Curated annotation (Swiss-Prot):
Domain of life: Eukaryota
GO terms for cellular component: endosome; endosome membrane; Golgi cisterna membrane
Effect of inactivating the gene: No visible phenotype; due to redundancy with NHX5. Nhx5 and nhx6 double mutant has a slower development, is drastically smaller and is salt sensitive.
Location of Phosphothreonine modifications: T470
Species name: Arabidopsis thaliana (Mouse-ear cress)
Catalytic activity: Na(+)(in) + H(+)(out) = Na(+)(out) + H(+)(in); K(+)(in) + H(+)(out) = K(+)(out) + H(+)(in)
UniProt feature, compositional bias: Basic and acidic residues: 515-524
Family in the record: Belongs to the monovalent cation:proton antiporter 1 (CPA1) transporter (TC 2.A.36) family.
Tissue: Expressed in roots, leaves, stems, flowers and siliques. Detected at very low levels in roots and shoots.
Coiled coil stretches, renumbered: none
Protein name from the UniProt record: Sodium/hydrogen exchanger 6
One GO BP: regulation of pH
PANTHER family from the UniProt entry: SODIUM/HYDROGEN EXCHANGER, SODIUM_HYDROGEN EXCHANGER 5-RELATED
Region (Disordered): 508-535
Length: 535
């Protein structure tokens, strides 16, 4: 069978080469048809406000149905190979534009106003969820409740299954309207969560391959090297691009093509630089997106700003939709190991427990550091807990684990992850709208403007901390508040030094001019997008 799939004989055989080209054409045509169907169906569902089948769920279903039909009809192998989910293709071509757009579309005001909470949920919370899941899976195996895996492999599974994909929840937020703080928490946590999960998985994989001489301290050091190094590479590339566009004088009419080409190349430069340094390209391109939107974007001409915003939004939408179709087709075509149903059942139970430990534990810590008027209400914490759907990132890492782990172990993890992804995307994703309305965190009462939610400046945050009585012995709470103050100090540093240095705005951080106008073009917090038209 493998000899039939080799390309080299077809090169010398005109008929074989023609057959390969025909199979490629049919495969790509089917993919395009599924993309068109997915976008049209998503539009119809949005137009009729049918929230029980979100766009991501519809795309996954289309892939599952077409893949099932191809499997039943014994579609020709050369055509089916065009639908195989390759983790290299996913990580090199599909994921980078999605992650970059996540960072590029961040709104600076809500993100930095909730920066401490977002970092707590995404970094500490993801670490807690990974460790809790891995430990529970290991204990479940020891107690003969489920298929037993070695401890490090359990931690690898905990890391990959902690990668959340709340695209369904965010789309419903956009349709129904949501509290600005809640949207910022869910979106910000999801952006950094993927980067954290990938770094944890790669660290655990490295520990497994070099198990001798490793200890917990070295694991933490290796993880910090990967994460901080990748973040530094991304931020460095972003700042370099900002200075280039500030001083190169490209924002003139006859150089707009060059301006846009250079801007589009920088994200992939950041990604490949990190990968070449054995770091995480996903972490790097994420922070490149954040920095380029905050600094480089304002150095572009008005026409180039409109083009790059539309371009990255376009390719990320195509990639995201294609990923769910691609994933659904591959799930239907792959041979899964369903012999360990106990592993699947208890894994689902354990990730629910781990997600609760993540959200409610971190929520408690964040509320310790916040004044009364800034505490995260329990309804928001429940919504954040419910939004922890698993998606393409967990699926891709699980597929990679099939190659990283011994035969049987990786296949068991892949099958369990597949079941979890399908369950969360279809069932939980379909009930998200009802759940959010029951919690009363969406609706017209939450359609507040972006500025209304963040009028309190950093000095008022700091004053509220100083004025509150601090009971004796609350040193931990004091340290948490110092961390929150550092976020406010960074905002002041950005306003007074970084923005004037890296942009041509001369420090006009909060004015209603060009920079703020383009930041607010993509505000997702209202039902009908009428926020920018307010009087």
């Amino acid at each position: 069978m493998s000899s039939e799939l080799q390309i080299s004989p077809a090169i010398h055989d005109p008929q074989g080469q023609e057959k390969q080209q025909q199979a490629a054409g049919v495969g790509i045509l089917l993919q395009i048809m599924m993309l068109v169907l997915s976008f049209v169906l998503g539009h119809v569902l949005r137009r009729h406000k049918f929230y029980y089948l979100p766009e991501a769920s519809a795309s996954l279903l289309i892939g599952l149905i077409v893949g099932g039909l191809a499997n039943i009809s014994n579609t020709e192998t050369s055509i089916r190979t065009w639908f195989n989910f390759h983790d290299e293709f996913f990580f090199l071509f599909l994921l980078p534009p999605i992650i970059f757009q996540s960072g590029f579309s961040l709104q600076p005001k809500p993100f930095f106003s909730n920066f401490g909470a977002i970092v707590t949920f995404s970094v500490l919370g993801t670490f807690v969820a990974s460790m809790v899941t891995g430990l529970l899976v290991y204990l479940g195996g020891v107690m003969f409740l489920m298929y037993r895996l070695p401890f490090v492999e359990c931690l690898m599974f905990g890391s990959l299954i902690s990668a959340t994909d709340p695209v369904t929840v965010l789309s419903i937020f956009q349709e129904l309207g949501s509290d600005v703080n809640l949207y910022a928490l869910v979106f910000g946590e999801s952006v950094l969560n993927d980067a954290m999960a990938i770094s944890l998985y790669r660290t655990m994989s490295l520990v497994r391959s070099h198990s001798s001489g490793q200890n917990f301290f070295m694991v933490i050091v290796r993880f910090l090297e990967t994460f901080v190094g990748s973040m530094s590479a991304g931020v460095g590339v972003g700042f370099t691009s900002a200075l280039l566009f500030k001083y190169a004088g490209l924002d003139v009419d006859n150089l707009q093509n060059l301006e846009c080409c250079l801007f589009v190349l920088f994200p992939y430069f950041s990604y490949m630089l990190a990968e070449g340094l054995s770091l995480s390209g996903i972490v790097s391109i994420l922070f490149t997106g954040i920095v380029m939107k905050h600094y480089t974007y304002s150095n572009l001409s008005a026409n180039s700003q409109r083009f790059v915003s539309a371009f990255f939004h376009l390719i990320s939408s195509l990639a995201e939709t294609f990923v769910f179709i691609y994933m659904g087709f591959d799930i239907a075509m792959e041979k899964h190991s369903w012999s360990h149903l106990g592993f699947i059942f208890f894994s689902i139970l354990f990730i629910v427990i781990a997600r609760a430990a993540n959200v409610f534990g971190c929520g408690y810590l964040v509320n310790l550091a916040r004044p009364a008027h800034r505490k995260i209400p329990m309804t928001h914490q429940k919504a954040l807990w419910y939004s922890g759907l698993r998606g393409a990132m967990a699926f891709a890492l699980a597929l990679q684990s099939v190659h990283d782990l011994p035969e049987g172990h990786g296949q068991t993890i892949f099958t369990a992850t597949t079941a979890i992804v399908v369950l969360t995307v279809l069932l939980i994703g379909g009930s998200t709208g009802t759940m959010l309305e029951a919690l009363e965190v969406v609706g017209d009462s939450h359609d507040t403007s972006l500025g209304d939610g963040f009028e309190v400046v950093n000095s008022r945050y700091m004053t509220s901390y100083d004025d509150e009585d601090t009971p004796p012995g609350s040193g931990f709470r004091t340290k948490l508040r110092e961390f929150h103050k550092s976020a406010a100090s960074f905002t002041e540093l950005d306003r007074n030094y970084l923005t004037p240095f890296f942009t041509s705005n001369n420090g006009d951080y909060d004015d209603e001019g060009n920079m703020e106008q383009h930041h607010e073009e993509r505000i997702p917090f209202t039902r009908r997008g009428n926020l920018n038209n307010r009087g």
